[in-house]
Regions:
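Glycine-rich phosphate-binding loops of nucleotide-dependent enzymes
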Residues: 2-244
Length: 244
């Protein structure tokens, strides 16, 4: 049995005129926070979008729980237990918080010969997952009544609702207040303790050194290396990111 829950091996992804990923790699252990770092354009988000099925790799392999898998799209990734909280939020503000948490995978029930959304179960489950991530929000309330930072925390609740084994957080604190950052770190610590593998993308060195167990650095689409976070300093990270 591999010590890794998920491996991305030799991933190549080319867009017109640019090789965004050039044999990139990442190895995630259970119950760890793995920071993914690099300058803008290093390929971090592209690699994660390949993991989550938004992009399809030109070359490379994804090994998940010991098996090579083909992730066909985001819903396939979610069904496998891989969730992603994007830097660019895609909320549906006119829908309820509960509907946003379960969009695309609503619980259903039979009403005679017809299959319909089971709203009672959806809202009960949404209330449970909101409580699990310490959010005191009414799942029936419209998402649009929340601030941008509160919507970001709902996205994390959405990921947790999928009972994820791998959680990708792409710049998760970009719109959060200091108190909300602390709330996020509490959630991350609890998920790590439950064995979830967390990928944490951030440019904030203090966050990386505080929350991470391992750090992988990318540069110009290439894998540079992986370090134990305890071995790193801000200067060493910057040196590896810029290559000089």
């Amino acid at each position: 049995m591999s010590e890794y829950r998920l491996e991305m091996r030799d991933v190549v992804k080319t867009f017109p005129g640019v090789k965004a990923l050039n044999h990139a790699q990442l190895k995630l252990k259970p119950g760890t926070v793995h920071a993914l770092m690099g300058e803008n354009g290093a390929g971090k988000s592209t690699l994660m979008k390949c993991m989550f099925g938004i992009y399809h790799m030109d070359e490379g392999k994804v090994i998940y729980e010991g098996q090579e898998v083909q992730i066909k799209g985001p819903l396939d990734a979610l069904n496998r237990g891989i969730a992603m909280v994007h830097q660019e939020l895609q909320p549906i503000p006119e829908r309820s918080i509960g509907e946003n948490i379960y969009v695309g995978r609503y619980p259903t029930k039979k009403y005679g010969p017809v299959t319909v959304i089971d709203h009672d179960k959806m809202y009960a489950d949404a209330a449970k997952v909101l409580k699990e991530v310490h959010l005191n929000y009414d799942p029936h309330a419209k998402l649009g009544t929340l601030s941008v930072s509160q919507m970001q925390l709902v996205e994390i609740a959405k990921a947790v609702s999928a009972d994820c084994k791998v959680l990708i957080l792409d710049e998760p604190t970009s719109s959060l207040t200091a108190a909300e950052v602390e709330a996020l770190f509490t959630i991350v610590d609890e998920l790590r303790a439950k064995g979830v593998s967390i990928v944490y993308i951030s440019h904030k060195m203090d966050e990386i050194l505080r929350i991470s167990d391992e750090v992988t650095i990318m540069r110009d689409g290439h894998y540079i290396g992986t370090w134990d976070a305890k071995e790193l300093t801000t200067d060493k990270i910057i040196t590896q990111m810029v290559g000089r």
